[in-house]
Amino acid sequence: MNTTATTVSRGRRPPRTLYRGDPGMWSWVCHRISGATIFFFLFVHVLDAAMLRVSPQTYNAVLATYKTPIVGLMEYGLVAAVLFHALNGIRVILIDFWSEGPRYQRLMLWIIGSVFLLLMVPAGVVVGIHMWEHFR
């Protein structure tokens, strides 16, 4: 029996690694999810725009269905996905191309998280104002 199996069998958890809940792993997962979300939005957006050529009446009907509170919340989610994807993309570029990037990757993750939260608050206010004006 090796020492890792012995350590786990005694109830102690092995050290946290990249694949066991490290913040960098969650950043990677969220980056993939935000990228897929943005791709899905762009796909639907292109289909909607193409609908204008087919039938302007159908296009207007589809746009009317987008004027609901749930779509307003989805817009806020889209802002969050684009903002996180952009900020984390900058962090990934710095890690890959800056010689000191790997050393500061955890600090950069916390900075990205802070900037994300600081920008999402005013974005939430703006989206909330638009929703309030639109749905009252």
Curated annotation (Swiss-Prot):
Record localization: Cell membrane
InterPro entries according to UniProt: SdhC_prok, SQR/QFR_C/D, Succ_DH_cytb556, SuccDH_FuR_B_TM-su
Keyword Iron: yes
Transmembrane stretches, start-end: 32-52, 70-90, 109-129
Keyword Electron transport listed: yes
GO biological process, one term: tricarboxylic acid cycle
Chain residues that bind heme: H85
UniProt xrefs under CDD domains: SQR_TypeA_SdhC_like
Cofactors: heme
Primary localisation category: membrane
Entry membrane topology: Multi-pass membrane protein
Disruption phenotype: Cells lacking the sdh2 operon (sdhCDAB) display a stationary phase exit defect after 60 days in culture. They show only slight difference in intracellular succinate and malate concentrations during aerobic growth or hypoxia when compared to wild-type. The mutant strain is more susceptible to proton motive force (PMF) inhibition than the parental strain, and it was impossible to recover colonies from mutant cultures after 21 days. Cells harboring a deletion of sdh2 consume oxygen at a reduced rate and are able to modulate respiration as dissolved oxygen (DO) is depleted to about 6%.
GO cellular component, as recorded: plasma membrane
GO molecular function annotations of the record: electron transfer activity; metal ion binding
Alphabetic keyword roster: Cell membrane, Electron transport, Heme, Iron, Membrane, Metal-binding, Transmembrane, Transmembrane helix, Transport, Tricarboxylic acid cycle
Disulfide bonds: none
PANTHER family found in the cross-reference section: SUCCINATE DEHYDROGENASE 2 MEMBRANE SUBUNIT SDHC, SUCCINATE DEHYDROGENASE HYDROPHOBIC MEMBRANE ANCHOR SUBUNIT
Protein family: Belongs to the cytochrome b560 family.
NCBIfam families (alphabetical): succ_dehyd_cytB
Assembly information from the UniProt record: Part of an enzyme complex containing four subunits: a flavoprotein (SdhA), an iron-sulfur protein (SdhB), plus two membrane-anchoring proteins (SdhC and SdhD).
Name the record gives this protein: Succinate dehydrogenase 2 membrane subunit SdhC
Organism for this UniProt entry: Mycobacterium tuberculosis (strain ATCC 25618 / H37Rv)
